[in-house]
Amino acid sequence: MDGDKVIENGSVVVTNNKITYVGEGTLAIKLPKGATSIDLEGKTIMPGLIDVHAHLGAFRGGVSPQKHWQYYTNLAYGVTTTHDPSVNSEITFAQSEMVRSGKMIGPRIYSTGTILYGADGDFKAVINNLEDARSALRRTKAYGAFSVKSYNQPRRAQRQQVVQAAREIGIRVVPE
C-alpha cells in the first residue's frame, strides 16, 4: 500500500497464502502453469484488518471448540489478525497453532497469554520478586507469546521486575 492510494484496475498474485505481487493494470508477470485466476472486476480488495485488543472467548470453561463463531465473525468483517492481551495461555496458543496449521478456521492469533495480574482473578501469575517475573515470562514465551501483559501490579518494584525480566528474556511488555 502507498498511503491512501487506490488502484482502480490492478492485479494481485498470491503464492502459498502470501501476497507476492501487486500491480496496476493487467498482470505484468507470468503466472505459473496451472495457476488459478479469479476475475474480480467491479470488486474491492483491501488488506486485512488487525484487532489489537481482542478477547475472543478462547477460555470459555476450558473448552476449545473446533469451530469458533467469533473467529468466523472476525473473518467475515475483514479482521484477519487479532491480539488478545489477557487469556488462558494453554488454550489460546493451542488455537493459534490450529489456525496456523489449517486445522481450524480463524484469524491469525497473537496473545500475551496469561496476564501478570497483581490482584485476584481467574488467570494470573503472582510476581513477588525478580525470579517470579523471570519464571512467568519464560513460561509465557515458551507457549509462543512475543509479549506479556502486566496489569494491576500493586508495587512499582513489581512492575520494574517484570520489565527487567522481559528485557533479559527478549519479550515485550504490554503495561496497564
Stretches with model-predicted labels:
Residues 21-23, 173-176:
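Short, hydrophobic beta-strand segments that form beta-sheet elements in well-ordered domains
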Residues 25-26, 51, 63:
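A generic structural motif
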Residues 40, 44-45, 49-57, 66-175:
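Divalent-metal coordination cores built from histidine and acidic residues
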Residues 59-61:
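N-terminal processing/targeting junctions
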